[in-house]
UniProtKB/Swiss-Prot annotation:
Location in or out of the cell: Cell membrane
Keyword list, A-Z: Cell membrane, Membrane, Transmembrane, Transmembrane helix
Organism: Bordetella pertussis (strain Tohama I / ATCC BAA-589 / NCTC 13251)
Pfam families: Cons_hypoth698 (PF03601)
Official protein name in the record: UPF0324 membrane protein BP2808
Membrane topology reported for the UniProt record: Multi-pass membrane protein
Main location: membrane
A GO CC term attached to the entry: plasma membrane
Length: 348
């Protein structure tokens, strides 16, 4: 009697999930190429922003062309892969960068992040009637690092994808406006800062890293260098902010469960991973070529996550809260421009 052994195919659920992940990866690869086109780069649109826009267009107009079973892979990319990518984003930060801007740069970063989060959360809920998640996601995008911060907050809050999408929209609109506005008001003589203070102001108040570089590069290289370092200092504050958010959510959950203390602590493990990898990067123990390769791969995975979020978002959901979210984005932008000016004046 002979026995034949054949290779069994993957179980259907896993095969469908893998197909969904690969589909998003192919879309993300196209997005990266699209974001690299000169006419898109000049506006400072990162692959993350282009990814969510392309994902939303596909999800709302062409979703029927994707097998429904692949949705599990899209969801996995928008949740699990997202968290891994946020953790590896820590390789973009180092203690040396934070030290380079000194106490004034750190003080401005802390002041801007804390005040913007507070204003956004309170104004969004009490003045504009937004739900907690949408208000906090929008505030995070303005306060810390644009789309990447929205991505980091979303799994911690367990927010719906469309809430992240509208928050990212404010980052795109007002961050892009900054790239044109800041050089204009500087050359008009309305920003009486030296190079160091000007770099701190731009890095401390513009939404995304690419937008910071876009705004500062229209002034001079020295300002661009300072602005980029200060911006990365704001990014580094993502970890303590997420940890505080986790403890606050636990306290809220405990209060809502008749004071029971066993409520699950939603401290995001990827925030710890972010911190560990930032320390690893500071120690300079990994080959520079390896770090560069991981950073590029991480941007690609983040682009996949944003694309997947876009696919899961529906325009009808955005229209429901769109005007109020944009109003909150405008309030926060006014605070960044004028309040940020005051904070820089005090710190420098």
């Amino acid at each position: 009697m002979t026995t034949t052994t054949s290779t069994l195919p993957l179980p259907t659920p896993w095969r469908d999930k893998l197909n969904g992940i690969l589909f998003v990866a192919l879309m993300a690869a196209a997005v990266v190429q699209l974001a690299d086109l000169p006419f898109i780069r000049q506006f400072g649109f990162s692959p993350l922003v282009v990814g969510i826009v392309c994902g939303m267009l596909y999800g709302n107009f062409l979703r029927g062309t994707m097998p429904a079973d692949w949705g599990a892979g899209v969801h996995f990319t928008a949740r699990r892969l997202l968290r891994i990518a946020v953790a590896f984003y820590g390789l973009n930060i180092s203690i040396q960068q934070i030290a380079a801007v000194g106490l004034p740069g750190l003080a401005v970063s802390v002041g801007v992040v804390a005040s913007t989060l507070l204003i956004g959360t309170v104004a969004g809920q009490r003045l504009l009637g937004l739900d907690r998640d949408t208000a906090m996601l929008t505030a995070a995008g303005s306060a810390i690092c644009g789309a990447a911060a929205v991505l980091a907050f979303e799994p911690t809050l367990r927010a719906a994808p469309h809430k992240s999408a509208v928050a990212v929209a404010t980052v795109v609109l007002f961050g892009t406006l900054s790239m044109f506005l800041y050089p204009v008001i500087y050359h008009a003589g309305w920003l009486p800062f030296d190079t160091q203070a000007l770099g701190i102001y731009i890095g401390g108040t513009v939404h995304e890293v690419a937008q910071v570089v876009g705004a500062a590069s229209n002034i001079d290289p020295a300002t661009t260098e300072v602005a980029t370092i200060v911006k990365m200092t704001r990014v580094a504050l993502l970890v303590p902010v997420l940890l505080v958010l986790g403890f606050w959510l636990r306290a809220s959950a405990a209060a809502g469960a008749d004071g029971k203390s066993h409520a699950k602590l939603p401290v995001p493990w990827f925030a710890i991973g972010f911190l560990v990898l930032a320390i690893v990067n500071s120690l300079d123990i990994l080959p520079s070529d390896l770090v560069t390769a991981i950073r590029k791969l991480d941007v690609f995975v983040l682009t996949m996550a944003m694309t997947a979020l876009g696919i899961e978002t529906r325009f009808a959901q955005i229209r429901k809260a769109g005007p109020r979210v944009m109003a909150l984005g405008l309030v926060l932008y006014a605070w960044l421009v004028f309040g940020g000016y005051g904070i820089v004046k005090l710190a420098t």
